[in-house]
Amino acid sequence: MGPLGFVAVGVGAAAGAWLRWGFSVLWNAINPAMPYGTLAANLLGGYLIGLAVGFFDTHAGLPPEWRLLAITGFLGGLTTFSTFSSEVVANLIAGDYGWAAMHLLLHLGGSLLLTALGLWTYRMLA
C-alpha cells in the first residue's frame, strides 16, 4: 500500500469514528443497558459494507484506495466490535445476563442480516 492508501484509510477511519461517536452521544444514554448508538453504528455499518462489497465487486477497475477509504477506513471506524464487547462484558459483570444475550443477538445477528441485505440491495439496483 502506497502513501495514498494510508491517507485513504486514515481519512475514512476518522470520518467513521466521528459518526460512531455522534451516534453514541445522541443515543447511548437512552438505555445504558442497551446503548442504542453502538447498535446503530454496527447495524448501519453491516448494511453499508454489504452495499460496498457489491459495489466494489462490480467496479473492480476503481483504484484500490477507494475500497480502503470506504471499507477499511470509514466502515472500520464506524463499526464498534471493541465497544460492543466491553458493553456485553459490563452487562455480564452487572449480572444483566438477559441484556448481554440481547446485545449478542442484536449486534451479531442484526449485522449479519443487514450485511446480506446490503449486498442484496446493491445487486437488485445494479
UniProtKB/Swiss-Prot annotation:
Gene Ontology biological process: cellular detoxification of fluoride
Bilayer topology annotation: Multi-pass membrane protein
Compartment list: Cell inner membrane
Pfam families: CRCB
Membrane recorded as keyword: yes
Membrane spanning residue stretches: 6-26, 36-56, 69-89, 99-119
Gene Ontology cellular-component terms listed: plasma membrane
Protein's job: Fluoride-specific ion channel. Important for reducing fluoride concentration in the cell, thus reducing its toxicity.
Family: Belongs to the fluoride channel Fluc/FEX (TC 1.A.43) family.
Entry protein name: Fluoride-specific ion channel FluC
Lineage of the species this protein comes from: Bacteria, Pseudomonadati, Pseudomonadota, Betaproteobacteria, Burkholderiales
